From Swiss-Prot:
<dbReference type="InterPro" id="IPR044773">
    <property type="entry name" value="DDX18/Has1_DEADc"/>
</dbReference>
<dbReference type="GO" id="GO:0000463">
    <property type="term" value="P:maturation of LSU-rRNA from tricistronic rRNA transcript (SSU-rRNA, 5.8S rRNA, LSU-rRNA)"/>
</dbReference>
<feature type="compositionally biased region" description="Acidic residues">
    <location>
        <begin position="93"/>
        <end position="112"/>
    </location>
</feature>
<feature type="compositionally biased region" description="Low complexity">
    <location>
        <begin position="598"/>
        <end position="608"/>
    </location>
</feature>
<dbReference type="InterPro" id="IPR000629">
    <property type="entry name" value="RNA-helicase_DEAD-box_CS"/>
</dbReference>
<keyword id="KW-0694">RNA-binding</keyword>
<feature type="compositionally biased region" description="Basic residues">
    <location>
        <begin position="11"/>
        <end position="21"/>
    </location>
</feature>
<dbReference type="GO" id="GO:1990417">
    <property type="term" value="P:snoRNA release from pre-rRNA"/>
</dbReference>
<keyword id="KW-0539">Nucleus</keyword>
<dbReference type="GO" id="GO:0000462">
    <property type="term" value="P:maturation of SSU-rRNA from tricistronic rRNA transcript (SSU-rRNA, 5.8S rRNA, LSU-rRNA)"/>
</dbReference>
<comment type="similarity">
    <text>Belongs to the DEAD box helicase family. DDX18/HAS1 subfamily.</text>
</comment>
<keyword id="KW-0547">Nucleotide-binding</keyword>
<dbReference type="GO" id="GO:0032040">
    <property type="term" value="C:small-subunit processome"/>
</dbReference>
<dbReference type="GO" id="GO:0016887">
    <property type="term" value="F:ATP hydrolysis activity"/>
</dbReference>
<dbReference type="Pfam" id="PF13959">
    <property type="entry name" value="CTE_SPB4"/>
</dbReference>
<dbReference type="GO" id="GO:0003723">
    <property type="term" value="F:RNA binding"/>
</dbReference>
<feature type="compositionally biased region" description="Basic and acidic residues">
    <location>
        <begin position="51"/>
        <end position="63"/>
    </location>
</feature>
């Protein structure tokens, strides 16, 4: 038995001579990275412990004190020396994402000697032994929360000092370990509300990579997940805990490798998270202490209800704190809260006392515009506001693709963002627009939820939202934060003015804007000529036209957005056609009620007489 120990000792001595004081940290890091890969983690490393004990006894107190000095010095000097000496790789793969690896190693070195339980397996001490700061009253500033110095330094670097209302009311109970169901407007500061308590918990329990995942944040869209990840990166910059992101469209194998190395704070979209929970061997999540479900209503709206139920069922529920945030409270959200939260959660709603459902500082308007003038008005508006930062919302991916191709072709540069793009393209576009001082982004509702895009001047709703909730989330992309200003404009056709009544009931204040006819640039004839001559634009325009009609037919507010009231000739002109093109369109169940009307002699919009089933051929005129 003594032979192997001597060999290990001699190897360690050689490493020490070669690398200096960081050699032990490097070996410990290698051990920490590989450990979770072995059957979810329970590995006994007591022989290594005995070896360290013998070594320290043999070398005496002076040498161990000297060793601690070297370790602390290396952590104080900065990141570079640690990176050279084998500092642990950050979960997201960026070398600069963990700026305090040195502190991590010195903490691990000092902490391992005092807490054998932590090094012997992936298990953690019970959350019941956790002591997080308790706050009395309602604090106004982050410095009054009793947070760790590392967290406060990161918050200060981010430029925050005073808390928003949702932060004041949620962070103290979350630090106390309560389950919270929070409701707040978009742009109110929810992200820090759940990340600060999560990071404090990870730090207090001294999570290491080998302990696996302690916090999971579930987000409805990839872009929102990337945004939360960016905030987490800033918040964790002085902490030693690892963090990562798993989203659909990204490299699954690379994600699995990071999870096996150990990701303490994980941001994820539901589908990819469930995939890893079920199929990634070595993904340690038995130590999960906090589950955050952000934009819960949106997660359920986009069809992830089954996935969320499975995720909640798979994750350990004992000692788990759950935070569920939702801008709107629906029956489905209440059902999810019932299965995920512990009995007696704290319900926090910061909006119910407000006069309006949208943020202050937001000027909201609408314009009544015929279908054939909609594109001309949009073109004129964008031309006059080239120096502004604008987001334009459309109802379908094909509408976005067509208008992006058209506007870029006629030298009005725009960026596009929609669900049919590859993930890398979506990510690049999102960050390019975030960093831009001016420009136009045209997109579907994939960008309507939670995204914090700086300094947006105008939100244009070219196609109407499905309901007032979607309207609120769309306009929430501007006037974000304290004292911020922004403006929104919604295009409505004369047949759609009934939507204003629904907005009024939802406490959304809108006023009518007027655009003088002589200010609208009339490029209709040039547009029709271009669409008639350019094969690719013509094909794209047809797809956009077809998708627009499909989206319109599937509107939830059928009483307002009645597809039968559309003037197809005018709609077609808006897409650059002199006469409506002949297209095949599958409307599915959304028009099942129209079958009876057809049988009673009423033709569906633009359909040929005696058409069978739900396939309609468009005519030029009705």
């Amino acid at each position: 038995m003594s032979g192997p120990v001597d060999t290990a000792k001699s190897i360690t001595k050689k490493r020490k001579r070669k690398h200096g004081g960081g050699a032990r940290a490097a070996t410990e890091t290698d051990d920490a990275i590989t450990r979770p890969a072995i059957e979810n983690g329970a590995v006994n490393d007591s022989p290594e412990k005995e070896e360290d004990t013998k070594k320290s006894e043999k070398n005496g107190k002076d040498k161990s004190a000297k060793k601690r000095k070297v370790s602390h010095a290396s952590s104080d000097e900065g990141d570079e020396s640690q990176e050279e000496q084998g500092a642990p790789a950050q979960a997201d793969g960026d070398s600069d994402d963990n700026k305090d690896d040195g502190n991590d190693q010195s903490e691990a070195e000092n902490g391992d000697n005092g807490d054998k339980k932590d090094t012997e397996s992936t298990d953690l001490p019970s959350a019941g032994t956790l002591s997080l700061p308790t706050v009395e009253g309602e604090p106004q500033k982050f410095t009054e929360l009793g947070l760790s110095e590392k967290t406060l330094k990161a918050i200060n670097d981010m430029g925050f000092e005073t808390m928003t209302e949702i932060q004041r009311r949620t962070i103290p109970p979350l630090l106390a370990g309560r389950d919270v169901l929070g409701a707040a407007k978009t742009g109110s500061g929810k992200t820090l509300s759940f990340l600060i308590p999560a990071v404090e918990m990870l730090s207090a329990l001294r999570f290491k990579p080998r302990n696996g995942t302690g916090v999971i944040v579930v987000s409805p869209t990839r872009e929102l997940a990337l945004q939360i990840f960016g905030v987490a990166r800033e918040l964790c910059q002085y902490h030693s805990q690892t963090y990562g992101i798993v989203i659909g469209g990204a490299n699954r194998r690379a994600e699995a490798e990071k999870l096996m190395k150990g990701v303490n704070l994980l941001i994820a979209t539901p589908g990819r998270l469930l995939d890893h929970l079920q199929n990634t061997q070595g993904f340690v999540f038995k130590n999960l202490k906090t589950l955050v479900i952000d934009e819960a209503d949106r997660i359920l709206e986009v069809g992830f209800e089954d996935e969320m139920r499975q995720i909640v069922k798979i994750l350990p529920s004992e000692e788990r704190q759950t935070m569920l945030f939702s801008a709107t409270q629906t029956t489905k959200v209440e059902d999810l809260a019932r299965i995920s939260l512990r009995p007696g959660p704290l319900y926090i709603n910061v909006d119910h006392r407000k006069e309006h459902s949208t943020v202050e500082g937001l000027e909201q308007g609408y314009v009544i515009c015929e279908a054939d003038k909609r594109f001309l008005l949009l073109f004129s508006f964008l031309k006059r506001n080239l120096k502004k930062k604008i987001i334009v919302f459309f109802s379908s991916c094909n509408c976005v693709k067509y208008h992006a191709e058209l506007l870029n072709y006629i030298d009005l540069p725009v960026l596009e963002l929609h669900g049919k793009q590859k993930q890398q393209k979506r990510t690049n576009t999102f960050f390019e627009f975030c960093n831009a001082k001016q420009g136009t982004l045209i997109c579907t509702d994939v960008a309507a939820r939670g995204l914090d895009i700086p300094a947006v001047d105008w939100i244009i709703q070219f196609d109407p939202p499905d309901d007032p909730r979607d309207y609120i989330h769309r306009v929430g992309r501007t006037a974000r934060g304290t004292n911020a200003k922004g403006r929104s404009l919604m295009f409505l056709q004369p047949s759609e003015v009934g939507f204003l009544k629904h907005l009024k009931e939802a406490r959304v204040p809108v006023v009518e804007f007027e655009f003088p006819a002589n200010k609208i640039v009339n490029v209709q004839s040039q547009l029709e000529k271009l669409i008639g001559q350019n094969y690719y634009l013509n094909k794209s325009a047809k797809e956009g036209y077809r998708s627009y009609l499909q989206a319109y037919a599937s509107h939830s507010l059928r009483s307002v957005f009645d597809v039968h009231k559309l003037d197809l000739v005018k709609v077609a002109k808006g897409f650059g056609f002199s006469t409506p093109p002949r297209i095949d369109i599958q409307l599915g169940a959304s028009l099942s009620r129209d079958k009876k009307q057809q049988q009673q002699g009423r033709r569906s919009y633009g359909s040929q007489p005696h058409s069978k089933g739900l396939k309609f051929k468009r005519k030029h005129d009705d």
